[in-house]
Each structure stands twice: as C-alpha cells, then as structure tokens.
Amino acid sequence: MAATAHGLCEFIDASPSPFHVCATVAGRLLGAGYRELREADRWPDKPGRYFTVRAGSLVAWNAEQSGHTQVPFRIVGAHTDSPNLRVKQHPDRLVAGWHVVALQPYGGVWLHSWLDRDLGISGRLSVRDGTGVSHRLVLIDDPILRVPQLAIHLAEDRKSLTLDPQRHINAVWGVGERVESFVGYVAQRAGVAAADVLAADLMTHDLTPSALIGASVNGTASLLSAPRLDNQASCYAGMEALLAVDVDSASSGFVPVLAIFDHEEVGSASGHGAQSDLLSSVLERIVLAAGGTREDFLRRLTTSMLASADMAHATHPNYPDRHEPSHPIEVNAGPVLKVHPNLRYATDGRTAAAFALACQRAGVPMQRYEHRADLPCGSTIGPLAAARTGIPTVDVGAAQLAMHSARELMGAHDVAAYSAALQAFLSAELSEA
C-alpha cells in the first residue's frame, strides 16, 4: 500500500507513544511477511525479511535477495518520540479539592499548546507475573486529563504567558472522594492488578483526531493537521518506503533498512537511542548471518548510506522573518534536503547528490533548507548515527509548521512524495566516478 495522507492519519492516531509506534510498525511488517527476531536469540543464517524491537526503537531489513556479504545497506532512520507531557512517578496530588496528576515536560515541548485540551494516557506498564516481569502497552483514549489555563482576569500579565513547568502544567482528573491512585486507575483500565505494577512509563496525548483540512483541490484537502508529525510522519513514510521496496525492488543492489529510534528529543543517549549500539549491532549481525566477517562488515559500511528523516520547518506566513530569506520552504512542494555548515545536520556533498538523484528518480521536486545564521539550529539523529557507524548520511524531511506543538500542520500531498523519495533512496544506485 502506497503512503497516503489518510494512512498517515490512521498511523498517528494508533500510535500515541514510542512503544505504540513500534507496535504499529511491527504489525504492518508482520502482515507483509517479516519475521521478528529477539536480540537475545541466535539469528537465522538464511536471507529473509526481519525486524527486531528494543523498547521504543525498531530496526527492520529486507535481505531476501541479498546474501552476498558485500552488498551495501541503504538505511532510512527516523525517531519514534515526540515532545509531550509525561506522568511523574508519584503523580497524585490533592489541591483545593481537585485531584491532580503531576506531569513533567519531555523534550522541547511547546508548553502553552497543551493547555485546555482533552488528554488521554498511553505508554507501558511493567508488571509482575508468574514468570517474572512482563510489559503491557497502555492506551486510554478517553478524556481523563486536562491542564487548565488560568483565567485572563487572574493573570499578572495579560499580554504574555509564562509557564512554570513545575507548577503550571499539572492536570486535573476529578474532584471529591477518590480512593485509588492514578497509576492504580490506569492499571485497572489495562486489566492489571495495581499491586502487580512494578513500573509505569506513562505519557499524555491530545485526543483530537488527525484530520485533513483546508481548501480542497479536485476533492482532496491540501493540509494535514495532527499531533506528533515530528516525527511520526517520517516513521510512516519510511515504513511505507521499505514495504514498497519489498514489492518493487527486492532485487536491488542494496539491503534496505528502516531504523526508528526513541529518545531523539532528549539527545538520543540511551540504550536504544541513536547513540546506542542498536543500529551498528544489527547491521553487523546481518553480515555475520550471511557468512561474512567483521572485516566484511566494516568494508560494507563504507559503501552504505543513511537518510536521517526528520521533519523540516516550512516558512511561516506570520513569521517570515524567522527564516533564511534565500531558502523559502513550502508545504506540498516536495521533500526537503537539510544542510548546516556546523554539522547540526549530517549532509555533505556526496549524500546530498544521492538524495537529489533519488528525488529525480521518484519524480518529485526537492527543496533545500538552510537555517538562519543568527538563530540556534536544532539537530537530528543524523550526526549521531553518522558518528556512531561511520556511514555517510543525509538529513532530509517534509515541511511543516508548529513543530513541537501539541498539534502540528503539514501538506497533505507531501506524504506520498516524501515516501516515494525515501523508497527511491532505498533502491536507487548512485554512480560515482
């Protein structure tokens, strides 16, 4: 199934946490004939389509047609996490008769965008069972939480909004008598005894469904409004690209790989973030399973290439002065190649040419993004993955507005173009003299 705007909406609405992103992708892969491998097991020595999951991260690859130990990798990397409000370990508060859940910001969350929204809960419970500990996904898609804003009549300054993340972003979830704890309530909703919950990784999500909005052209809406476009739009586009390569280009001279990592929004320095050994260890095991050696693996990295797929800033119509004037970026105008002289993005001349060629072969336009020199620039998994693996890397994305808001906006037509470019990158060869 090709990537579509409707498909992205369904993907996002089913995936409110990094754990759910991995579960959604895993479900699609299993349906397409992929087999899940556990890292602790011995991996099969025959070609095939496989994936492995480490907490909120996943790596998938199609080596069905590529048994030779020197076939290079073509990798699409993205991240599964998004800035949000997360539940503290001891969240229960009682303030002026209100039952309050203590929250804290995760990543560079745009705090004010979370006020006065109906919020659900998602994440993972670690539960004691008969054999030890098991992990259960949690999804409560009911409006159980809300972070209420202060009335304008009570504000110290009506012209600006300053939020203290310790005091001002806690959520209410009821009044009056309540015996159970918040985690106990979540456990009950998940069908688990509260006494068996050993740990909880819980986070909030906006309950407004993803939607196609804006003026329609030939019956098709031009814009897509959704939470977590940064960076679930890239996870979805990369997943569909990998599955399309399976159908169209399995005899390619590359092993196509999808690597989606948790914790990008907080620096990637975790046991399953982009700074971990997850990608490099999986790639080495692919080579070893094909009968190769570590020497073969190291040689293979030099001919491989990685596209770090993360969303890009479209030029904002209300704040055009916040953008580089010679590099306007539009929605519905094709994927974005991102370049930064101080390596906030990993793109160099060789990898930029590879992605430009991929866009040409996919028949989609490509835009080039440069950040204003007088503003600090964010980064991606690109420089981190490149440093960890030594694989030449290009940073790319799709254009959007309102990055890190609870609700973001992109071009509906960019979904298919973005995935098509990534598909071409996974399968198209770059000839070099």
UniProtKB/Swiss-Prot annotation:
One GO molecular-function entry: zinc ion binding
GO terms under cellular component: cytosol; plasma membrane
Binding site for Zn(2+): 79, 153, 404
Cofactor: Zn(2+)
A GO BP annotation: proteolysis
Enzyme Commission number, as recorded: 3.4.11.-
Pfam families in the cross-refs: Peptidase_M18 (PF02127)
InterPro entries from the UniProt entry: M18_aminopeptidase_2 (IPR022984), Peptidase_M18 (IPR001948), Peptidase_M18_dom2 (IPR023358)
NCBIfam families: PRK02813.1 (NF002759)
PANTHER family reported in the protein's UniProt record: ASPARTYL AMINOPEPTIDASE
Family affiliation: Belongs to the peptidase M18 family.
Name listed for the protein in its UniProt record: Probable M18 family aminopeptidase 2
Taxonomic lineage from the root: Bacteria, Bacillati, Actinomycetota, Actinomycetes, Mycobacteriales
Gene transcribed to yield this protein: apeB
